[in-house]
Amino acid sequence: MLLGDFGTSYSKFLDLASARPEPYIIPSKELRSVHRVTIATGHNGKRFSDRYVNELTVLARGGERLIAEDDFVLLDCGSRDIKFIHYSNGCLNNMGWNNECGASMGFSIELLERYYDLDFHELPLPDRPFSVTCGVLGMSRIFDAVQVP
């Protein structure tokens, strides 16, 4: 069984039929019609499978399977949107999908990384979060926070 998450920038795959399943990534611009999967999710998922599962459902089920905590928040910052799942006491508490204010944030973060040649593992965390209500409008705060040597 081949699973696929067909995002705008990257597509992620996992072949559960292999002896040691390992995920792999392909830039979405390199996808061709031969990239058919058993079950798909993501922005372009319906183009590559007859069985499509909503991204919030996939995020919630994956969190249940992979996270041993009763209380957690999952955040998926994608190229076109931001999704979150919140579990409390082992039960789904809340979920959301922002494709307006969150639009392009993942892509913008990736552009910043490439433009400034950043290693996000090396950057210090800010003392406090940015006080913005819109990701696109908050870009100036992010640019200000990136200090280039």
Outline where the language-model segments fall.
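Acidic-glycine-rich active-site phosphate/pyrophosphate-binding loop
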Residues: 39-43, 78-88, 135-140
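N-terminal glycine/serine-rich phosphate-binding loop of ATP-dependent small-molecule kinases
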Residues: 1-61, 71
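Electropositive phosphate-/nucleotide-binding environments in soluble metabolic enzymes
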Residues: 7, 53, 57, 102-106, ...
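Membrane-embedded alpha-helical core segments of multi-pass
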Residues: 8, 79-82, 112
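Conserved phosphate-binding catalytic cores of ATP/NTP-utilizing and phosphoryl-transfer enzymes
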Residues: 49-90
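Glycine-rich phosphate-binding loop plus the immediately following alpha-helix
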Residues: 89-139, 144
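Short acidic-glycine loop/turn motifs at beta-strand connectors
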Residues: 15-19, 86-91
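Structural signal for hydrophobic packing residues in well-ordered secondary-structure cores
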Residues: 67, 71, 113-116, 146-149
